[in-house]
């Protein structure tokens, strides 16, 4: 189980944008099923409200799911194969997932779920983990009625430094700080009230996340 909140504050160097904030509030619920010593199944359901939060309604709601099989080759190597789905405002977003998990040493781990995420993580204490993450994401935000309920499509590539601190084997405090070297926007289904150029010329900005989540880590469960 987990929850997250993201807020994108838009800033234009030349003038003020018509849309100044895009926000997303999400709840994740997932589980891990061990089939045998070598195979496991992971599932995750994500429910999200994603919009400018001007006039909230059921039109701002999205639902998604992730599922994959994990094969453990040995105590240091795992591979994953699965599928990602999210109901975006332009329609369903579906693509395959190829994952890996390499234990490089007692404290160093390299893992990812391609094409969306790659992590390099170092265990700094019994409960603390420090890492570097690469994210690629395409998502959408519903606009208010004054913009004809159009939506903004965002594509971004992010680099993040993060820290996780486990209060116990499942509950963790997390924080992240990073930068998006690539961020692009497109606007769809509007009536001309919001010119496209108002979103494509924004300066890339620093970002930060913090929160509390319930996570199941196989390496902690095995200890």
Where are the predicted features?
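Transmembrane beta-barrel domains of bacterial outer-membrane proteins
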Residues: 1-55, 62
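Outer-membrane beta-barrel translocator/channel fold
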Residues: 4-21, 114-208
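Transmembrane beta-barrel outer-membrane domains
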Residues: 18-24, 56-62, 72, 89-93, ...
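Hydrophobic, lipid-facing positions within transmembrane beta-strands of outer-membrane proteins
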Residues: 23-29, 45-49, 61-67, 94-98, ...
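Residue-level signature of outer-membrane beta-barrel architecture
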Residues: 33, 71, 102, 112, ...
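Repeated loop/turn-to-beta-strand initiation elements of outer-membrane beta-barrel proteins
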Residues: 37-43, 76-81, 107-110, 127-130, ...
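Transmembrane beta-strand segments that form the barrel wall of outer-membrane beta-barrel proteins
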Residues: 41-51, 77-87, 95-118, 134-136
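Outer-membrane beta-barrel "beta-signal"
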Residues: 97-103, 163, 202-223
